[in-house]
């Protein structure tokens, strides 16, 4: 009986040390003391005591760092390297993109919640609040979903004019280039407000203020490119889109086959070294009405005109849509929502090297650009649209449940209906809170890749569940 008791004490000590992640040397001392007590009082046989002391001796040797690394860590690492697939450069770029924010505490296993509560809550500036209360509310009153969706299959011209006039396409562009220079929180709240009224408007406004020509130029463009394009984008004289999705690759961005070959050609009457582009993209929002096309393609230089490499990889460039060979105008109709979305094609389109965002020095850096900017951008547009859609569903469903009566009682009084309404409200609260706390990081200049990816998935998924409950 004594042996069983001390065995339980010994195993309990091992479990407690592991659970609390006690430092190795202290763990060794504690286990040694417990083993001495076990040897003295348990009455166990010499054979089992010998086994336990041998195991403890092996454990104690782990305190010799050089020996541990050479005899244990290195062989285990070699085995794991052979078992794990080799990371490609594109995969490594995706994994290393962005920054680590408070979520690092979560993944440590021992998060400091006080650190989260000490973070400053993001607030709107006076200009941002005025824009949310003024032009955003006006746009909601102008854009009526029924005629947009069922009669016009587009936003009416007064709505387009209002969006241009009030600078809705320039929310992320700094004031020095004619934009609003709003914070991520402000953009998130503006898009959520628009999405609570009409998905067409929120999507149309969201695209120029997310991953696209303006954001790429702000982070990677040359000063000449910024001066050339940003004022026009801010005033909406230029309508941007970003063509990433290849018809052959879909969401596998690294598998795109759209190509650009460095060669000599004629541009504006002069023979220059440029890029001859061929692409076939689809599901590109704003492509049917775009004047400038952000294009992702794979760059090749078979004649080594710009360097000693044959292939540079994914590259991002800005292409005016009025160039010969560029095809836009056709439309898709995603799930019946008539925001401008469609295919774009290019056949032997010749452009100068300075169309590459950041200049020719950034050739082949397109994938890195995209994954770094996605680390922040995906935490704003889709999550905000999901919040706005969920809010609209909760408002409409809750009101309907109060005025719709069955058996002389509002259906909101029925437990089944009340349960669905409670679930919808809870999901909407979670989505809103998650968006706000993520905007806290974005407002501080962080690019938290993991939280934004989690937020994008869960907000859209919870929005789908809210929609299901609303329809039920």
Where in the sequence are the language-model features?
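Alpha-helix capping/hinge segments and adjacent helical runs
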Residues: 103, 447-472
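A glycine-rich, basic-preceded beta-loop-alpha segment at the flavin cofactor/substrate interface
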Residues: 329, 343-378, 395-412
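Catalytic nucleotidyl-transfer cores of nucleotide-processing enzymes
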Residues: 291, 299, 323-348
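Beta-sandwich/jelly-roll carbohydrate-recognition scaffolds of carbohydrate-active enzymes
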Residues: 228-231, 245-270, 282, 302-304
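Amphipathic, small/basic residue-rich leader segments at the start of a protein or domain
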Residues: 5-17, 26-38, 47, 51-208, ...
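A short core secondary-structure module
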Residues: 270-327
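Extended amphipathic alpha-helical segments enriched in small hydrophobics
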Residues: 378-445
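Internal maturation/activation junctions in enzymes
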Residues: 231-258, 439-446, 452
């Amino acid at each position: 009986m004594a042996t069983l008791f001390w065995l339980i004490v010994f195993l309990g000590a091992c479990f407690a040390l592991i659970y609390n992640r006690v430092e190795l040397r202290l763990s060794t001392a504690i286990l040694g003391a417990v083993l001495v007590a076990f040897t003295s009082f348990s009455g166990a046989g010499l054979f089992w005591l010998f086994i336990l002391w041998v195991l403890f001796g092996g454990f104690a040797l782990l305190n010799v760092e050089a020996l541990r690394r050479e005899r244990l860590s290195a062989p285990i690492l070699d085995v794991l390297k052979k078992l794990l697939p080799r990371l490609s450069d594109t995969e490594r770029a995706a994994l290393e993109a962005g920054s680590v924010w408070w979520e690092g505490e979560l993944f440590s296993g021992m998060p400091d919640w006080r650190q989260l509560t000490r973070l400053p809550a993001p607030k709107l500036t006076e200009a941002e609040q005025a824009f949310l209360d003024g032009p955003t509310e006006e746009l909601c009153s102008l854009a009526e979903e029924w005629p947009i969706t069922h009669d016009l299959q587009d936003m009416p011209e007064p709505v387009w004019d209002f969006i241009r006039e009030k600078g809705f396409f320039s929310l992320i562009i700094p004031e020095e280039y004619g934009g609003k220079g709003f914070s991520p929180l402000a953009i998130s709240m503006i898009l959520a407000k628009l999405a609570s009224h009409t998905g067409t408007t929120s999507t149309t406004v969201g695209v120029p203020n997310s991953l696209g020509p303006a954001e790429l130029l702000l982070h990677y463009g040359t000063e000449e490119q910024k001066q050339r394009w940003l004022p026009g984008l801010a005033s909406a004289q230029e309508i941007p889109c970003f063509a990433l999705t290849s018809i052959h690759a879909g969401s596998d961005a690294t598998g795109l086959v759209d190509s650009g070959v460095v060669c000599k050609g004629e541009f504006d009457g002069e023979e220059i070294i440029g890029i001859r582009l061929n692409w076939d993209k689809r599901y590109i929002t704003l492509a049917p009405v775009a004047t400038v096309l952000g294009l992702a393609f794979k760059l090749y230089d078979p004649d080594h005109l710009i360097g000693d490499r044959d292939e540079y990889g994914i590259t991002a460039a800005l292409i005016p849509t009025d160039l010969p060979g560029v095809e836009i105008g056709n439309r898709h109709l995603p799930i019946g929502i008539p925001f401008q979305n469609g295919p774009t094609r290019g056949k032997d389109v010749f452009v100068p090297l300075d169309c590459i965002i950041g200049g020719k020095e950034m050739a082949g850096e397109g994938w890195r650009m995209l994954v770094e900017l996605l680390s922040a951008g995906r935490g704003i547009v889709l999550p905000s649209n999901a919040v706005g859609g969920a809010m609209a569903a909760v408002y409409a469903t809750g009101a309907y449940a109060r005025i719709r009566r069955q058996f002389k009682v509002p259906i909101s009084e029925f437990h089944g209906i009340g349960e669905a309404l409670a679930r919808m409200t809870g999901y909407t609260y979670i989505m809103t809170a998650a968006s706000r706390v993520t905007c806290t990081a974005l407002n501080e200049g962080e690019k938290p890749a993991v939280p934004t990816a989690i937020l994008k998935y869960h907000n859209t998924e919870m929005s789908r569940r809210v929609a299901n409950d609303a329809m039920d």
